Each structure stands twice: as C-alpha cells, then as structure tokens.
C-alpha cells in the first residue's frame, strides 16, 4: 500500500461504517457488519481518510449536527478517520432509496420484474428519479467535492454500488481531472433487460458510470453485459482489453471477485455466544440430516422455491421423513417496500404449509428462524450436511464461501448457477437452475445420499478453492490497478 501514502482515500457508500442509535437514553455507536467495512475501514484509518455516507438514523443526524459540515472524527477518544454524513430530508431519501434504488434498479439488475405487469414507469417514478435519485446523488457528489477541496493530497475516490450511479458524473463535471473508481456489488443485467429503463435513465446511469477510470464487477459476465449496454448507447468498445471509450476518456471495466475474511470467521467460532448457539443447533439436528439456508428475506434469494424443492423431495422420498431437518434462518429486510412485506408473509406461509402437510407430533420438517443472529448462522455453518444457496441472481453471494470454511461435517453445497460465486466454485458444488424445483429436489437427494468419500472430496475441494482468495485479494487487486493507472 505504499502508493497510498500520498493519497487521500475517500470511500463513498449509501450505508457507512458506523451507525448511531439510542440505548437506555444515551446515543451509542455500532460498527457496521460485513466485508466491505472490515476491509476498507483499516485503509481509511491508516491514511486518515474519509468515509462519506448517508445519515441512516435520527441519531446519525443528531451526532453529525454537532460537528462542522457534519464531519464526525472517529474514534472519539483517538480520531483516525472521519465519517462525513450526507443528510437528506426523509421524503427525498425514500424516493431515492425505496422507489428508484429498490425496487426499480434492484429488480432490473436481478431480473425480478414480472414484465407483463410491472414496472409501471409513470409520472411518480419520474418524479422519484428527479427529486430523489438525482438529488441525493448530487448531494453525495457535493460532499465528495468538498472532501477533495479540503485536502492537499491526491484524492482516491472509491464509490460503492447501485445507489450512486450518477455521483461520479457530477463529481467529474465539477472537479475535472480526478481519479474515480466504483465497484458494483450486484449483477449487471443483459442489455435487453436493461432496456426496461427509459432511455433518459439508461443514458444518465451509463454516463455517470463512465466518469470512473475503473469500474469493477464481481465476474466477467457482468463486465460483458455492461459493455454491451454501453455499445447499445453508441459508445466505442475495446472488448479485448475491457475498455469503454467516451471521447478522450477511458473507463477500464474489470472483475474483482469478492471473498471472505478467514480470520474473522475463526474468531466467531471461539465466542461464548457461538458455543451456546451450537448447542441449540446440535439438539435441533439430533441424529437427523441437517439441511440449512440463510438469507435476507429478499425476493432475489428465491427462498420459496427452495422450500418447494424440499417439499417435492419429501414427497418423492418418504424414507427421509423424520430423518432430516431443514433449518432456515434469515432477517427481515426493506420492510418499508410492499413487495418485501408480501414476500416475507409468503415465505412464512410456505413454511407453515409444508410443516402442516408433512410434520407430526415428533417431527417438524422446517425450523424457520426469522431474525438476525450471526452466531446461530455460524453454528449452522459448522454443522450442516447440505447447504442450499439458490438465488434467482446474485452479484457474488459469499454464503458458500463462509460456510465452507466453517463446516466440519463434509457438508455438500447446492448452488444456483446464477450466483456470481458459481463461476469460481462450480467444480465442488451441485449446481442447479434456480427456477427448476425438480432439479433442486433431486440435488437434495443427491447431497444426502452421497457416499462419504465423495462428500469429503467436494468439501475439501471447496475449502481449498475458497482459501485461494480472501477479501484482501479483492481490495489489493483494485489497488494494483489504481496504482498502474494513476501513474
């Protein structure tokens, strides 16, 4: 990281590395979870950088208001970096986040719209675009520009994800010659599906993203899809070298597969909370096979088809009744959006239906725990015999990677061919079409009936494959490209 010594790293994301909330009448701080924070925050801390993010809670805004320009130095007792909060009125934020970012963009990028009926891109959507998405992206850009102007070091701007597609264009227009990069953590759709968006929105998004010098995706397929969308709008392509030409400017389109932090996973497995949850999982499993899945209650995760596949497995293989337990954990997400509330209810209804149909006084086929509990997830990772990860589409999905490193039962993974990680892991998983319930039911039987030596071969191969790339490879490969292109 020597090249960072004269740089001012500025990370830009909708959700930041910390969140403030009220507990027992006092405002307290919670560090954000996930690989993005654990990987990039040490960089920001080491080089006294800045993280620009939305004020997600009233307490975020309250704390930010106590500092000039809403720039909060952290940690409070020994500041090593700054969180620079973007504060937007609630109505505009909801238009930006809960109308345009999700569901409109999220559903397009995960192929989830029921196109004979939805989306209906009417005057309300256009208003949410103009007054919400465009407005908030301008606010983020203004904040980043302020950070660039206040620091004499060369700025290194790293924007994150689909909430901020327009932001780099606004920055470039004001600042001019500045190095911008952006990583998109979700899939990029094929060009025909991207055309669901009106041309005005498509052009604005592509123009914004092409203001970056480096644009990152998880896998090569998403890079190709993006470049084809650029070609549709008349941009010149150097497909062999992964470059989109925009006049005199070049955008280098690269794939950087994200991974996991093995050290963090090992630490989790040593905690008292983990041991307590492992006792629960082992009692739940008893001498049965344990099938496991964990998801946010997001429509893209394809939870209901996973349960329907299990239902078909039980129908076709009654010899497994009473000998298998399906544990599913997950947390509610985006419940302010009607489609998500309806889906959460449908998931619970499906579980109740299957348990009523096949269960009895001594056996409950599915145990569904609808809350966030990482120690419980980790305990299930360690003890599953079969893991199901069957998203309709997913940028990467690190669940199979985390689970493989923790599992001690030579567990087998059933993995959707539409998960980004399938490109890396295909050799050591049972791949399925996420829409094919029959194929997934057969995969469950194959996983549970598999001979122990084959289970071990797949499990050991998967562990080895995951260890080849940690989350630090993801960030270091980006820095290597930045260093080369900034010279």
Question: What role is predicted for each listed range?
Answer:
Residues 1-487:
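Catalytic cores of carbohydrate-active enzymes across secretory and cytosolic contexts
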């Amino acid at each position: 990281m020597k090249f960072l010594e004269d740089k001012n790293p500025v990370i830009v994301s909708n959700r930041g590395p910390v969140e403030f909330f009220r507990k027992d009448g006092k405002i307290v701080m919670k560090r954000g979870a996930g690989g993005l924070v654990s990987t990039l925050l040490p960089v920001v801390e080491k080089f006294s950088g800045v993280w620009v993010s939305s004020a997600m809670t009233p307490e975020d805004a309250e704390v930010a208001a106590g500092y000039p320009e809403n720039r909060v130095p952290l940690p409070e007792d020994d500041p090593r970096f700054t969180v620079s909060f973007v504060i937007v009125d609630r109505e505009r934020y909801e238009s930006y986040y809960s109308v345009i970012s999700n569901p409109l963009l999220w559903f397009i990028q995960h192929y989830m719209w029921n196109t004979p009926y939805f989306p209906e891109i009417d005057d309300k959507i256009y208003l949410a675009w103009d007054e919400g998405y465009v407005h908030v992206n301008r606010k983020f850009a203004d904040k980043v520009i302020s950070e660039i102007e206040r620091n004499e070091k060369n700025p290194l701007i790293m924007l994150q994800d689909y909430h901020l597609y327009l932001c780099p264009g606004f920055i470039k227009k004001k600042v001019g010659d500045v190095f911008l990069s952006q990583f998109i953590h979700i899939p990029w759709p094929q060009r025909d599906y991207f055309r669901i968006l009106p041309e005005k929105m498509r052009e604005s998004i592509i123009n914004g993203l092409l203001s970056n010098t480096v644009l990152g995706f998880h896998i090569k397929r998403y890079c190709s899809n993006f470049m084809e969308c650029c070609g549709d709008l008349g941009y010149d392509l150097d497909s062999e070298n992964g470059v989109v030409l925009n006049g005199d400017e070049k955008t280098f389109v690269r794939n950087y597969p994200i991974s996991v932090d093995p050290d963090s996973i090992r630490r989790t497995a040593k905690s008292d909370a983990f041991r307590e949850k492992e006792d629960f999982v082992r009692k739940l499993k008893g001498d049965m096979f344990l099938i496991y899945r964990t998801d946010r209650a997001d429509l893209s995760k394809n939870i209901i088809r996973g349960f329907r596949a299990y239902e078909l497995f039980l129908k076709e293989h009654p010899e497994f009744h009473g000998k298998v337990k399906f544990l599913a954990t997950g947390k509610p997400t985006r419940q302010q959006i009607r489609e998500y509330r309806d889906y959460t209810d449908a998931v619970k209804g499906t579980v109740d239906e299957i348990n009523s149909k096949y269960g009895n006084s001594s056996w409950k086929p599915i145990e569904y725990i609808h809350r966030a509990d990482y120690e419980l997830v980790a305990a299930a990772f360690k003890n599953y015999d079969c893991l199901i990860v069957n998203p309709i589409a997913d940028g990467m999905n690190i669940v199979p990677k985390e689970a493989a490193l923790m599992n001690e039962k030579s567990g087998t993974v059933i993995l959707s061919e539409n998960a980004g990680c399938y490109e890396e892991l295909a050799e050591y998983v049972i791949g399925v079409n996420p829409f094919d319930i029959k194929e997934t039911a057969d995969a469950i039987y194959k996983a549970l009936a598999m001979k122990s030596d084959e289970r071990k071969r797949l499990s050991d191969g998967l562990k080895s494959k995951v260890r080849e790339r940690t989350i630090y490879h993801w960030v270091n490969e980006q820095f290597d490209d930045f260093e080369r292109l900034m010279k």
